[in-house]
């Protein structure tokens, strides 16, 4: 039997599988039982609105009501955003993973332990902060020297420059996300100012 919410439950299942999350993990996050989630995904039970919202939020999704005439524009925005960010994030994660493996083998090449720790922390953050295409190019250029390090290991000065470039990218990504999140006005007016 096909339910009216079938297309929504199919999208929720696809989102769960894309995040490589098991039904058990989704159950723990959403507060629904695993059998309930299984029945919803198989289509043997029509979920209530509350259950749909719980599952969607556990998957970092939101259920939104939008005017039907805006749906083509919304679909285009979602498709273009997911296509570009998935490719960049995949490339970025591969590069960060490669650098983390390199770092595990060559940690002693850094001038100081604090510089090595900063480099490691920067990589850990860059695994989760999306970079623009231009920033990814800079990231690739800054770390390209490490790919050739087996035959010709980089000097401490080169490692210091690479660590500085990676830290700069990390800082740019962190501050961009923070600045985009909270719009601030150019002027602050204090309503309780008695000097007026």
Swiss-Prot record:
Residues 12-66 form the HTH cro/C1-type domain. CDD domains: HTH_XRE. One of its GO terms (molecular function) is DNA-binding transcription factor activity. One of its GO terms (cellular component) is cytosol. InterPro entries: Bact_TransReg_Diox (IPR050807), Cro/C1-type_HTH (IPR001387), Lambda_DNA-bd_dom_sf (IPR010982). Pfam families: HTH_3 (PF01381). SUPFAM superfamilies: lambda repressor-like DNA-binding domains (SSF47413). The keyword Heme does not apply. This is Uncharacterized HTH-type transcriptional regulator y4dL.
């Amino acid at each position: 039997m096909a339910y009216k919410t079938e297309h929504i439950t199919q999208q929720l299942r696809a989102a769960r599988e894309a995040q490589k999350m098991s039904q058990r993990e989704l159950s723990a996050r959403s507060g629904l039982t695993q059998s309930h989630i299984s029945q919803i995904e198989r289509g043997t039970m029509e979920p209530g609105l509350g259950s749909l919202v719980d599952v969607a939020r556990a998957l970092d999704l939101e259920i939104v009501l939008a005017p039907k005439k805006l749906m083509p524009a919304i679909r285009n925005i979602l498709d273009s955003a997911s296509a570009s960010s998935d490719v960049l994030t995949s490339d970025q994660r591969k590069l960060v993973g490669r650098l983390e493996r390199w770092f595990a083998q060559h940690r002693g090449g850094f001038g100081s332990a604090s510089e090595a720790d900063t480099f490691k922390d920067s990589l850990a953050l860059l695994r989760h902060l999306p970079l623009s295409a231009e920033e990814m190019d800079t990231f690739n250029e800054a770390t390209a020297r490490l790919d050739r390090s087996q035959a010709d290991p980089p000097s401490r000065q080169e490692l210091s420059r690479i660590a500085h470039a990676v830290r700069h990218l990390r800082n740019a990504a962190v501050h961009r996300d923070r600045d985009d999140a909270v719009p601030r006005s150019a002027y602050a007016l204090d309503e309780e100012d008695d000097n007026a």
